[in-house]
From Swiss-Prot:
Coiled coil: none annotated. InterPro entries: DiOHbiphenyl_dOase, Glyas_Bleomycin-R_OHBP_Dase, Glyas_Fos-R_dOase_dom, VOC, Xdiol_ring_cleave_dOase_1/2. Residues 6-121, 146-267 form the VOC domain. It comes from Sphingobium xenophagum. The lineage of its organism: Bacteria, Pseudomonadati, Pseudomonadota, Alphaproteobacteria, Sphingomonadales. NCBIfam families: 23dbph12diox. Fe cation binds at H149, H212, E263. This is 1,2-dihydroxynaphthalene dioxygenase.
Length: 298
């Protein structure tokens, strides 16, 4: 049975391309690629043509997310599997695939209403070295682990878990977090490769489709530089620097120009063979700026 191998790319609808251009390059260290298209720019994190497309729009939210399959045979098998499960799948035109810089593309929607894509054959610009937007000591963790992970809006956690299992992901609840109101949050984490998780959900009601995108540096010093820049620019920090219990990553969460969160990280462990759960993080991750959907005690 075919399974997706990585979270390959994101498309984001943004209202302020200029703000994003500066943030992505000067804060995160991503390479900004402007090909003269009036409505979009691209962000590189490695040798792919892009990992993130920033598309000028009327909203600030996730526009789509792309899950990779290995080849045309696996792609066709996945389309068939999803269709047989009663999920509406539209195989995209050649023009739409070219727009995504892939060889094959299909579109569908997950149970939370999040625009989802499966694809194969991304364009890799091996002739163009990655050039970070600011000085960096290392690179981003991508390769077979994909872009990073996303926390998505899902009203029905079980339906979402079943959907992502169809795509080939594995996982379960990894935290039981006791909230001030007496309720217990039980976020659900799923992986499809060595990255500890590529998608998660179950944080409760969300205004936007996406709560945060996490990406990871290969070098601790790059996380430290990013943290310094965020503090110098007085960018809202929702969760202070801390270490997660599940993936052991050292991270912090700060606002992006679209009003949701990017999680900057380093040092995550690989996905374990068996599941376990935690009641709190190892240290840090104290709540700071409110209103970004991470007002939970970690």
């Amino acid at each position: 049975m075919s399974s997706v191998s990585e979270l390959g790319y994101l498309g984001m609808s943004v209202t302020d391309l200029d703000a994003w251009r500066a943030y992505a390059a000067e804060v995160a260290g991503m390479e900004v690629v402007d090909e003269g298209e009036s409505d979009r720019i691209y962000l590189r994190m490695d040798l792919w043509h892009h990992r993130i497309a920033l598309i000028k729009g009327d909203t600030d939210d996730l526009a789509y997310m792309g899950w990779r399959l290995g080849d045309p045979t696996e792609f066709e098998s996945m389309v068939e599997k999803l269709t047989n499960a009663g999920i509406a799948v539209t195989v995209a035109s050649d023009a739409e695939a070219r727009e995504r810089r892939v060889l094959g593309l299909a579109k569908l929607t997950d149970p939370g209403g999040n625009p989802t894509e499966i694809f194969y054959g991304p364009q890799v610009d091996a002739h163009k070295p990655f050039h970070p937007g600011r000085p960096m000591f290392g690179k981003f963790v991508t390769g077979s682990e994909g872009i990073g992970h996303c926390i998505l809006r899902q009203d029905d956690v079980e339906a979402a878990a079943a959907f992502y299992r169809l795509l080939g992901l594995r996982g379960s609840v990894e935290y039981q977090l006791h909230l001030p109101n007496g309720m217990v949050a039980m976020p659900y984490f799923m992986h499809c490769n060595e990255r500890q998780h590529s998608v998660a959900f179950g944080l409760g009601p969300m205004e936007k489709r996406i709560n945060h995108l996490m990406f990871e540096y290969t070098e601790l010093d790059d996380l430290g530089l990013a943290h310094d820049i965020v503090r110098e620019r007085q960018i809202d920090v929702a969760l202070q620097l801390g270490k997660h219990a599940n993936d052991l990553a050292l991270t912090f969460y700060c606002a992006n120009p679209s009003g949701w969160l990017w999680e900057f990280g380093w040092g995550a462990r690989k996905a374990p063979a068996q599941q376990e759960f935690y009641t709190r993080d190892i240290f840090g991750h104290g709540n700071e700026a409110q209103g970004y959907g991470m007002d939970v005690p970690l």
